[in-house]
A protein has these predicted regions:
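PDZ-domain C-terminal substructure recognizer with occasional recognition of PDZ-binding tails
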Residues: 194, 200, 214-259
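Conserved PDZ fold ligand-binding element
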Residues: 183-210
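Terminal peptide-recognition signature
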Residues: 24, 62, 134, 188, ...
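Functional transmembrane alpha-helices
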Residues: 114-122, 169, 250-358, 378-382
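Small-residue-rich helix-interface/hinge motifs
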Residues: 4-110, 114, 360-381
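Internal alpha-helical transmembrane segments
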Residues: 23, 34, 58, 69, ...
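Short extracytoplasmic/periplasmic juxtamembrane "stem" segments immediately C-terminal to an N-terminal membrane anchor
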Residues: 160-187, 194
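Residue-level signature of transmembrane alpha-helical entry/exit and packing/kink sites
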Residues: 5, 9-13, 122-130, 346-350
């Protein structure tokens, strides 16, 4: 039964991702038609056609391999300068040959009556809207999905409230991680922190969230820490202690360990609901993380490929494909550690984050990504 749930969760999530990709292409299709660009095809998937139907001049359909989608806008590439619109018979150099090949493919779809309806003939601002329409659609989808999850079910967030105080300093490599015999107490234990304490100030700075508290601890290294907590409704100044330096996962690259301050407490995790402002903050945080991941993406892909060749274990923080995300969704669906509501919320949160990633990835200013065409339109406008 667990296997059936796993497969079902993975398939449903994969279908939702493909629907998102289909809507991404709608984001290109609609403004293209509004601006009069000739659109010959709208397909979800690649390879052999499973189903199609022609409406007007556009053929809509589904293909065998559900690994993406496309909209064919006629005239994406302008003719070579000084030509009559057709391609040269001979090309010199590999890059010119590639460009001429692309122009040749475009010419096959151009008919005598298409003048004025070709993509390259449109104004720069129209090209910009058409090409940005896809990524913007994914951003809208991400916002709607995350707003639904946050507003209806809520999101689990760490609070600036102590859930558990760690008794002693136990190295991660220690053979016995349960005994405190002969080991020093943690700074939190020395300060007299208790479960249920709400942290309201750290070194005189008001604390309003766990993220703020976590950053304060990490950057404090081995310096003095003065904690103020709210205990049983009373404000309590705890004895000052020094945080200690230890190796913790890097905020931006969890696979890397960095030196940071350590206090020795675990925060309370509670489900919180929120509105558009909360979702906007979450999406901005996701955007920062995604942008950092995109910068490191080429190196991560190289390392993953090298590990496949050499047989080394795959980095758990390495690149994840749509199939990999679907597997993760299947694991969430099959687990018995959370209830059904939490599973649905987790799946849609993952779907929202995938949509945001697709949007940001497509904004990368390189062809054949949407960002490459957007960069070209901006260059023309300037």
């Amino acid at each position: 039964m667990e296997l059936v749930i796993y497969i079902g969760g993975a398939v449903i999530f994969f279908a939702l991702v493909m629907a998102s990709i289909g809507l991404h292409e709608v984001g290109h299709l609609v403004p293209a038609k509004i601006f009069g660009v000739k659109v010959t095809q709208y397909f979800v998937g690649f390879g052999r056609t499973l189903w199609s139907r022609r409406i007007g001049e556009t053929q809509y359909g589904v293909k065998l391999l559900p690994l993406g989608g496309y909209v064919r806008l006629v005239g994406m590439f302008p003719p070579a300068p000084g030509s009559d619109g057709r391609v040269r018979r001979y090309s010199t150099g590999p890059f010119r040959a590639m460009a001429d090949s692309a122009r040749a493919a475009e010419w096959e779809n151009i008919e005598p009556g298409d003048d004025g309806r070709l993509f390259y003939q449109k104004k720069s601002w129209q090209k910009l809207i058409i090409m940005a329409g896809g990524p913007i659609m994914n951003i809208v989808l991400a916002a709607v999905i995350l707003l639904g999850v946050t507003g209806i079910y809520g999101v689990l967030r760490a609070q600036p409230v102590v859930s558990r105080v760690q008794e002693c300093m136990i190295p991660a490599t220690a053979p016995d991680t349960t005994s405190c015999a002969g080991r020093p107490a943690t700074p939190a234990k020395l300060a007299g922190m208790r479960a249920g304490d709400r942290i309201i100030a750290f070194n005189g700075v008001t604390i309003s969230s766990w993220d703020q508290m976590s950053t304060a601890i990490r950057t404090n290294l081995d310096h003095r820490a003065q904690l103020t907590v709210l205990r049983d409704g009373h404000r309590v100044e705890l004895p000052p202690v020094n945080t200690v330096v230890t190796g913790v996962p890097d905020k931006w690259d969890p696979g890397k360990r960095v030196a940071a301050g350590f206090l020795g407490l675990e925060p309370l995790v509670a489900r919180e609901r929120g509105g558009p402002v909360v979702v906007a903050k979450d999406m901005w945080h996701m955007t920062e993380q995604t942008a950092y991941a995109l910068v490191r993406f080429p190196a991560k892909v190289y390392r993953t490929a090298a590990n496949l060749i050499t047989g080394k274990p795959r980095d758990q923080y390495g690149p994840m494909s749509i199939v990999g995300a679907s597997r993760a969704a299947g694991e969430v669906a099959a687990t018995d550690r959370i209830d059904v509501g939490a599973k649905i919320a987790a799946l849609f949160t993952l779907l929202g984050s995938v949509n945001l990633f697709v949007a940001l990835f497509n904004f990368v200013p390189l062809l054949p990504l949407d960002g490459g065409h957007i960069a070209g339109a901006l260059y023309e406008a300037v």
